[in-house]
UniProtKB/Swiss-Prot annotation:
<feature type="region of interest" description="Disordered">
    <location>
        <begin position="1"/>
        <end position="48"/>
    </location>
</feature>
<comment type="similarity">
    <text>Belongs to the class-II aminoacyl-tRNA synthetase family. HisZ subfamily.</text>
</comment>
<dbReference type="GO" id="GO:0006427">
    <property type="term" value="P:histidyl-tRNA aminoacylation"/>
</dbReference>
<dbReference type="InterPro" id="IPR004517">
    <property type="entry name" value="HisZ"/>
</dbReference>
<comment type="pathway">
    <text>Amino-acid biosynthesis; L-histidine biosynthesis; L-histidine from 5-phospho-alpha-D-ribose 1-diphosphate: step 1/9.</text>
</comment>
<comment type="subunit">
    <text>Heteromultimer composed of HisG and HisZ subunits.</text>
</comment>
<dbReference type="InterPro" id="IPR045864">
    <property type="entry name" value="aa-tRNA-synth_II/BPL/LPL"/>
</dbReference>
<dbReference type="GO" id="GO:0000105">
    <property type="term" value="P:L-histidine biosynthetic process"/>
</dbReference>
<keyword id="KW-0028">Amino-acid biosynthesis</keyword>
<comment type="function">
    <text>Required for the first step of histidine biosynthesis. May allow the feedback regulation of ATP phosphoribosyltransferase activity by histidine.</text>
</comment>
<dbReference type="Pfam" id="PF13393">
    <property type="entry name" value="tRNA-synt_His"/>
</dbReference>
<dbReference type="InterPro" id="IPR006195">
    <property type="entry name" value="aa-tRNA-synth_II"/>
</dbReference>
<feature type="compositionally biased region" description="Low complexity">
    <location>
        <begin position="27"/>
        <end position="38"/>
    </location>
</feature>
<dbReference type="GO" id="GO:0004821">
    <property type="term" value="F:histidine-tRNA ligase activity"/>
</dbReference>
<dbReference type="GO" id="GO:0005737">
    <property type="term" value="C:cytoplasm"/>
</dbReference>
<protein>
    <recommendedName>
        <fullName>ATP phosphoribosyltransferase regulatory subunit</fullName>
    </recommendedName>
</protein>
<keyword id="KW-0368">Histidine biosynthesis</keyword>
């Protein structure tokens, strides 16, 4: 899923960590052939540990709501990824296989998951509740017109086979649960749900002359009041564009304004019920009819979660996408969201537990004859770990035959609290490096 762009610069709201800190000049002295390509980066152990913890927190929430994990290919047929023209071909990193078939690295998850649902999972019980974690890859257009490739990590869910405002509510309350679980709600800043409805916005735009629709829609998506006020547009198109930009604020006020406009009454009723449920569950909602996601497959509600001026999640309803992948052109409603872990980790405060990178113990054979006993001791301590294994419960073995003072310096540098010194007869004593 895309938002208005892929980052905070399109938000409606206002450094990698390392196991050891490298020297500041290191990156500038490394040959370009030894660095990852532009838009990609290495994730070093401490950052991986934070990311894994975040993923585990989200997984618990997803499963608590009845969602099961799905893993789709990183590489797909290009036609699958384009989702019937909803995704621009130039935004996909493309390659050709040995048979000449055009392939691409997925730029988002929804198309691949809906493809799997419409083929491999067709005929099964509905609704399908699926979640995912993984990387997506995009060509992003620079201001001068060239493209740069970028890799992002995403976590999210897709609910397929359930339409209506209640399914919308499930997804949005699940999103709120995810945000609470990772600790955003307990930070100094709060988060806000920006909620729009493509069907209502398109209903209003239908009165705009076809020749002006693209320009008005683009101005709305970019919040470009200046263009709408000054461009040579038909006056009716200008007024409708400005009217849509004004439909933003507290749900009660916006819903009252919408009730005076030519929009489908059943959609207005559903949106009112949805906003009421969200309010009852403590979700801060800003209703925004100018919220137009960049993907053409959205058909109903669209939304962004914003914290501290940055988009942390986005999604929407896509009721016509399933039929594109169904061999029988069967239609099934769908809705989902994706969270942006890179942004979440940047906003969340450092976790003291993940700062403690060191393993629990370092086992050192003092003499070669003590190696069998050291191996046995390390194995026994590992087997005694009853909690889910993390690095802080791990047991390392000394491999480099270093002097005791060098071993202690290593333990201090790696924050290892205990060293077990093993004798030839299997006896050992423990020290605690300062």
């Amino acid at each position: 899923m895309y938002g208005r762009g892929s980052g905070a610069e399109h938000s409606r709201g206002s450094g990698a960590e390392h196991f050891w800190d490298p020297r500041p000049e290191a990156s500038s002295t490394v040959s370009s052939s030894l660095r990852p390509p532009s838009g990609a980066r290495d994730l070093l152990p401490r950052e991986v540990q934070r990311r894994e913890k975040l993923e585990a927190q989200l997984t618990r929430v997803f499963r608590r709501h009845g969602y099961q994990r799905i893993i789709t290919p990183t590489l797909e047929r290009l036609e699958t990824l384009l989702a019937g023209g909803s995704i621009r071909a130039e935004s996909v990193l493309q390659l050709r296989d040995g048979e000449g078939t055009m392939l691409g690295l997925r730029p988002e998850f929804t198309a691949s998951i809906v493809r799997a649902a419409a083929t491999r999972l067709a005929g099964g019980p509905l609704p399908l509740r699926l979640y995912y974690h993984g990387s997506v890859f995009r060509n992003s257009r620079r201001e001068e017109g060239s493209y740069s490739s970028q890799e992002f990590f995403q976590s999210g869910v897709e609910l397929i086979g359930a339409g209506g405002w209640l399914a919308d509510a499930e997804i949005l309350l699940l999103l709120a649960d995810c945000i609470r679980s990772v600790g955003i709600s307990s930070c100094e800043f709060s988060w806000t749900l920006l909620l729009g409805d493509v069907s209502l916005t398109e209903s209003l735009l239908s009165a705009v002359a076809p020749t002006a629709q693209a320009a008005v829609r683009r101005a709305i998506a970019q919040l470009d009041y200046v263009y709408l006020e000054s461009a040579p547009l038909p006056e009716a198109a200008r007024q409708i564009g400005l009217q849509i930009l004004g439909l933003r604020g507290q749900p009660g006020s916006v819903l009252s304004d919408l009730a005076q406009l030519p929009v489908p009454p059943e959609r207005l009723r559903d949106l009112r019920q949805l906003c009421q449920v969200l309010e009852e569950h403590g979700v801060r909602v800003v209703l925004d009819l100018s919220l137009l996601q960049t993907l053409a497959y959205y058909t109903g509600i669209v939304f962004q979660a914003v914290a501290s001026g940055e988009i942390i999640a986005l999604g929407g309803r896509y009721d016509r996408l399933y039929a594109l992948y169904s061999p029988q052109q069967v239609e099934q409603p769908g809705i989902g969201f994706t969270l942006l872990p890179d942004t979440l980790l940047r906003l969340l405060p450092p976790d003291p537990q993940t700062e403690e990178m060191g393993c629990k113990r370092l086992v050192v054979p003092l003499v070669p004859a003590g190696i069998p006993a050291a191996l046995a001791l390390a194995a026994r301590w590992r087997e005694e770990c009853t909690a889910p294994l993390t690095r802080t419960e791990a047991v390392e073995l000394e491999l480099l035959d270093r002097a005791p003072e060098e071993i202690e310096a290593y333990a201090r540098q790696c924050r290892i609290p205990e060293i077990a010194w093993v004798q030839a007869d299997g006896s050992y004593h423990i020290t605690h490096p300062g």
